[in-house]
């Protein structure tokens, strides 16, 4: 099903665990193999460690992949924009509660039946949304939280506070189960939007009656620093991308004004016998010269920003960022007769790609 990242190796001994690097990129998920019900049951997670001291709540991170398009296709294609915007200091995201049949969540349930799915939420992140500080806390404090990536058209990052799990690019289908008391920090979103399904796993009546110990969660200061550095880097990339789009809008307006003034000057020259006001012509020409200077400056600044973004964006993410910039340029409001101006002045040929 995946692998488990142990966080308390002395207390919670497990066999053959994989470790996670501080900054990890996961390749495109491979096609999942079909397994029998019995095999699938054996591969399920176990969130309780049975020891001589009794049942102990595990402090581990469980990472796997899910066929989300098959299981949650309706949630991915849902166009209802009924999310609630949360826009606070250092935190911006959209969230709404959803009802998900338990059968669709079978792969994140434990094999011992100690936890059950309670509340489910969809979290949507648009370009520049995310957490620069803090985390999202949902669910029972003695339970677990499953974070499932349903859709990602941009570059999503995720950090489980206090652990070594800092992911710089979450792929569709990626699933991370962690202690609810840790929370989940979504790093600033770059480019297109992403949708995550958050599932709260609460202790069942059976586990509560049996009793269990809740150990103190561990902490990884190095990962915390790495997450903060990565978050700041992503904020810089977002700011530069926004600047590129802004420069493009300013260029269109400058080209448009230049075109209009040039036509007006041509009109004045064509009717020189009637329009003899030389001061007017001089003023128009000065304005045209100023605009051309501004255009040159904008083009130079654009080249600098593109070079800067290329140095910050991972090579694997270049196409994603390029597609987002192109889409935003096409969708942003432009000047009057925009298409005509852009085409006639070859503005569409300007290289805004990284």
UniProtKB/Swiss-Prot annotation:
Keyword flag Lipoprotein: no
The entry's keywords: Late protein
Keyword Transmembrane appears in the UniProt entry: no
InterPro entries given in the database record: Poxvirus_F11
Function per UniProt: Stimulates increases in peripheral microtubule dynamics and may increase the motility of the infected cells, contributing to cell-to-cell spread of the virus. Seems to inhibit the signaling via the GTPase RHOA and DIAPH1/mDia.
UniProt record similarity statement: Belongs to the orthopoxvirus OPG055 family.
Protein name: Protein OPG055
Record organism: Monkeypox virus
Organism classification: Viruses, Varidnaviria, Bamfordvirae, Nucleocytoviricota, Pokkesviricetes
């Amino acid at each position: 099903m995946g692998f488990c990242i142990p966080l308390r190796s002395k207390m919670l001994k497990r066999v053959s665990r994989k470790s996670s690097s501080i900054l990890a990129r996961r390749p495109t998920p491979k096609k999942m193999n079909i397994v029998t019900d019995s095999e699938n049951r054996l591969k399920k997670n176990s969130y309780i460690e049975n020891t001589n001291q009794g049942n102990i709540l595990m402090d581990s991170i469980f990472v796997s992949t899910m066929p989300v398009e098959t299981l949650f296709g309706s949630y991915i294609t849902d166009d209802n924009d009924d999310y609630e915007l949360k826009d606070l200091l250092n935190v911006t995201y959209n969230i709404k509660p959803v009802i998900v049949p338990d059968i669709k969540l079978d792969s994140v349930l434990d094999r011992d039946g100690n936890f059950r799915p309670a509340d489910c939420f969809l979290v949507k992140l648009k370009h520049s949304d995310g957490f620069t500080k803090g985390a999202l806390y949902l669910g029972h404090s003695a339970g677990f939280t499953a974070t499932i990536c349903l859709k990602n058209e941009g570059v999503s990052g995720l950090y489980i506070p206090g652990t070594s799990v800092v992911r710089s690019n979450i792929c569709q289908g990626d699933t991370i189960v962690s202690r609810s008391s840790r929370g989940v920090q979504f790093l600033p979103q770059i480019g297109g939007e992403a949708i995550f399904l958050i599932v709260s796993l609460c202790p069942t009546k059976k586990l509560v009656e049996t009793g269990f110990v809740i150990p103190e969660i561990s902490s990884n200061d190095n990962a915390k620093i790495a997450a903060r550095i990565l978050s700041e880097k992503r904020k810089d990339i977002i700011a530069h991308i926004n600047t590129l789009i802004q420069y493009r809008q300013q260029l269109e307006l400058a080209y448009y004004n230049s075109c209009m003034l040039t036509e007006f000057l041509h009109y004045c020259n064509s009717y020189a016998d009637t329009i003899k006001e030389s001061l007017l012509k001089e003023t128009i020409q000065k304005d045209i010269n100023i605009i051309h200077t501004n255009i040159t400056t904008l083009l130079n600044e654009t080249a600098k920003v593109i070079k800067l973004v290329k140095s910050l964006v991972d090579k694997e993410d270049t196409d994603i960022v390029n597609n987002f910039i192109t889409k935003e340029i096409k969708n942003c409001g432009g000047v009057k007769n925009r298409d005509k101006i852009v085409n006639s002045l070859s503005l569409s040929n300007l290289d805004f790609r990284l």
